[in-house]
Amino acid sequence: MTAILERRESTSLWGRFCNWITSTENRLYIGWFGVLMIPTLLTATSVFIIAFIAAPPVDIDGIREPVSGSLLYGNNIISGAIIPTSAAIGLHFYPIWEAASVDEWLYNGGPYELIVLHFLLGVACYMGREWELSFRLGMRPWIAVAYSAPVAAATAVFLIYPIGQGSFSDGMPLGISGTFNFMIVFQAEHNILMHPFHMLGVAGVFGGSLFSAMHGSLVTSSLIRETTENESANEGYRFGQEEETYNIVAAHGYFGRLIFQYASFNNSRSLHFFLAAWPVVGIWFTALGISTMAFNLNGFNFNQSVVDSQGRVINTWADIINRANLGMEVMHERNAHNFPLDLASVEAPSING
């Protein structure tokens, strides 16, 4: 009998670190993208919590009229927000060391830029980490591709839109009421409800919710019975078991009779591809729509498109929406503008008869 002894090669500290970072045996996979993701998301989260609680008012419009957003300055969970960086800063990179003091940095909304840039870097790295773990496990890359939809949406409202409008002050505030304010002002200035890419996004989100509910209810309703009629069907299964617990043929037959034969899937892979692709493609289109409207390529304008034989306007829903848009635009940033852009750009009517 011959014993073969091999000398174990001593791994350097860097080598052990690399093995630990890329190990799929860890309880939570870190990965090289995680090395950047963890500090950026921790920074964004920490600054968000501190600023949401205690940040002083921010001069968002750059006109020396600070807006309060934190809890300690009179807000609640609904009205509170991280106020976007001041219009006086524009698109300038504004870290703490660029300000004369921390007070000035806070007054100009420095925390918003810090949170947004770290957050976007962090979620992009999370997407890369999904791909990295899939790669190391020999999986296909579509999980990261699906996650690219919310990443694209966040990038559109927090980065692309401010770039197109020329200032981080036009970015979406980080709060509940601030989000609604952003949506209302966006509609007023860009008529997003009349943009086909937004319509595709609505179809994607609502359709995805509908298909998810339909799929989940069908699967949980078409169990393969492993028990008798006298005991619960749940007794026939173990959590996490390898064997399938439902019959796709039965679900296909049920749904085919409920609507019509070709409205249901009899192939599990094509079904789940559809469930993933529908909302993802819809959200991609919405992000693309926000990114085009950032540069003022706005929704369709059908205002005053129907007139009678005398040339009088017959209002359509497009005119009703336009009237609402003008009202919203008049009311936002009241002290920063004398007139909304749509009204100020029209020639004054003749008054000499």
From Swiss-Prot:
Chain sites annotated for binding a quinone: H215, S264, F265
GO cellular component, one term: chloroplast thylakoid membrane
Propeptide span(s): 345-353
Gene3D superfamilies, sorted: Photosystem II protein D1-like
Source domain of life: Eukaryota
Single GO molecular function: chlorophyll binding
Cofactor: binding comment: The D1/D2 heterodimer binds P680, chlorophylls that are the primary electron donor of PSII, and subsequent electron acceptors. It shares a non-heme iron and each subunit binds pheophytin, quinone, additional chlorophylls, carotenoids and lipids. D1 provides most of the ligands for the Mn4-Ca-O5 cluster of the oxygen-evolving complex (OEC). There is also a Cl(-1) ion associated with D1 and D2, which is required for oxygen evolution. The PSII complex binds additional chlorophylls, carotenoids and specific lipids.
Keyword check for Oxidoreductase: yes
PTM characteristics: Tyr-161 forms a radical intermediate that is referred to as redox-active TyrZ, YZ or Y-Z. C-terminally processed by CTPA; processing is essential to allow assembly of the oxygen-evolving complex and thus photosynthetic growth.
Residues bearing PTM N-acetylthreonine: T2
Transmembrane segments: 29-46, 118-133, 142-156, 197-218, 274-288
Catalyzed reaction equations: 2 a plastoquinone + 4 hnu + 2 H2O = 2 a plastoquinol + O2
Annotated chlorophyll a PD1 binding sites: H198
Positions bearing the site annotation: Cleavage: A344, S345
Subcellular location: Plastid, Chloroplast thylakoid membrane
PROSITE patterns according to UniProt: REACTION_CENTER
Further remarks about this protein from its record: 2 of the reaction center chlorophylls (ChlD1 and ChlD2) are entirely coordinated by water.
UniProt function note: Photosystem II (PSII) is a light-driven water:plastoquinone oxidoreductase that uses light energy to abstract electrons from H(2)O, generating O(2) and a proton gradient subsequently used for ATP formation. It consists of a core antenna complex that captures photons, and an electron transfer chain that converts photonic excitation into a charge separation. The D1/D2 (PsbA/PsbD) reaction center heterodimer binds P680, the primary electron donor of PSII as well as several subsequent electron acceptors.
Assembly mode: PSII is composed of 1 copy each of membrane proteins PsbA, PsbB, PsbC, PsbD, PsbE, PsbF, PsbH, PsbI, PsbJ, PsbK, PsbL, PsbM, PsbT, PsbX, PsbY, PsbZ, Psb30/Ycf12, at least 3 peripheral proteins of the oxygen-evolving complex and a large number of cofactors. It forms dimeric complexes.
Protein name: Photosystem II protein D1
Gene that encodes the chain: psbA
